[in-house]
Amino acid sequence: MLWIWVPGILGLFGRVEALWPQPSEYSHGNKTLWLSPSVRFTYTNNQRSFIYTRPSYAGINWIPGGWLNLLQNPWGSAEQTVAEPLPNVEQFVEDAIKRTKHAIINSKFVPWKFHPRHQKFEPLVDGQHPTIEEVIINEASKTSQEWSPRNYVNGDEKYEIRISEDGEVQISSRSPIGTIRALQTFQQLFYSHSHSKSYTPFAPISISDSPKWRHRGLNLDISRNVIRPEDVKRTIDAMASVKLNRLHAHAADSQSWPLDIPSIPELAAKASYHPSQVWSSSELEAVQLYGLERGVSVFLEIDLPGHTAAVGHAFPDLVAAYHMDQWEKYAAEPPSGQIKLNSSAVYQFLDLLMADLIPRVSPLTEYFHTGGDEFNLNTYLLEINLGSNDRRVLTPFLDRMITHVHSSLRSSGVTPIVWEELVLDWDLNLPSHKTAGETGGVIVQAWRNSSAVKHVLQKGYQTIFGTGDAWYLDCGVGTFLNPRPGSKAVQNPYLDWCAPTKNWKHMYVYNPLKDIPVELQSLLVGGETHMWSELVDPVNMDQMIWPRAAAAAEVLWTGPRSPDNIQDASYRLAKWRERVVNDAGIRAAMVQMTYCLMRESGCEL
């Protein structure tokens, strides 16, 4: 038996392990175990237990406490409507167990790419290998009443998996989210066999795992190009597989407003790109629930006061410098226009917007992002009741607007997130967790460069990292701007502002702790990669996001990586990529050439 122990940093010992992100501690052998197609999952927490065998009425053997609706629909449903009550967290765990079993049993991932060509690597179907007949899950969690759908993702994510040579499986966790994380790892231990059932070649297995950071996110722009709910759900599936837990949906911008706001029907009706491309209230809730079922909290960003020109399609009187011919004087990108700062009508609009939106999203998330970036001063030269681009004049009006909106968020128990400019450029005195308590402060997201992270931390704010020089996924594809005839503003080679492309290796070795004093590191809540969508739509978004966001996911889960980790990471990340391409329909870009993955000779230099 080969026994390999992996404490944090993996070495290459002949066999490449299957797991992404890398667990905190991982040891394994080289014995094969089959997984029975009728394997039982026995789940126990402090309140109840159930046994799951197969998706049929006869296959669910309930110990007291089960729900009749699951007997009628044992697979559960991702689609929810506003009228339905929210599921409880125990149902999230049950659904995760069902998905895990279904995914393993129905996997199409045969890992031939990871063995020398024509090598017979699959176990013989000779009855000599033990079979896993039961997976026992013990969850030492709080009572279910203490977990709500929106906060359970903040629970203890630590878990352990023990698999013996004889096929005994024990999974232990301390919370529902810990159980879900364990199942996401458990699924990656198995492969499809060309002529038989699923198997793992790694027994015995011992895994102890927990994350480095609690906020592990992807920022997805759903406004500049049409990104539909089904595209976001597909993205959530990939996120969950690498233990990313926050989907930051940049939900509106100057180009379009795709969200239906029932109390302001004109907004999406006039500001969306097309009536068929509006996100209904039920679709938004369904996406949020779909994420929570998989351990991903979906929260919205409505950027204020910049990036709001789309509001002018419905309410032009609320927007200053709306659709100016020389847009570049009034905006970072076209079209120009920002909501007015000194307008009672704007405040009425914001109050109505928040009164509609926040009660709908807050039961399913604890965050709401109010933006605050790329705020153009010249715009307010054209606001009749203001007429100034002087920062000293504008600051009190900006401060008043942000404070007003944030007060409505806090009254609903929602934590505001803002972009870095509000505290670095405008020096607004927003409450931090030190001045307003753990839930009363804002979280600040740094984006322009890595030095901004340190500057935000020095002001005492909890901070999200993932800046343009490290984790921007849209960089390097070229500018969307066309040159005007005779203009030299846009020239060959027509680069975008953050070129070159941040490839997966670059994203993998980004160290968010570099140059951050130890005494400030506790303020780092985590990070996000960013998929801005000027040149992204559902056709190319998968390959633009993946596998690069997965590379960042390991940094967020396991901690900073180094160039010495890249060789091993290329094999593990490529295995993850093959798995989601084959089994989840994710059209992820390549990690490595097949020749290199087969390791017939070195692809190192």
From Swiss-Prot:
One of its GO terms (biological process) is carbohydrate metabolic process. One of its GO terms (molecular function) is beta-N-acetylglucosaminidase activity. It is found in: Secreted. It comes from the Eukaryota. The active site is at 293 (nucleophile), 374 (proton donor). Transmembrane segments: none annotated. Keywords: Glycoprotein, Glycosidase, Hydrolase, Secreted, Signal. The keyword Glycoprotein applies. Glycans are attached at residues 30, 342, 449. It catalyses: Hydrolysis of terminal non-reducing N-acetyl-D-hexosamine residues in N-acetyl-beta-D-hexosaminides. Belongs to the glycosyl hydrolase 20 family. This is Beta-hexosaminidase ARB_07893. It comes from Arthroderma benhamiae (strain ATCC MYA-4681 / CBS 112371). The lineage of its organism: Eukaryota, Fungi, Dikarya, Ascomycota, Pezizomycotina.
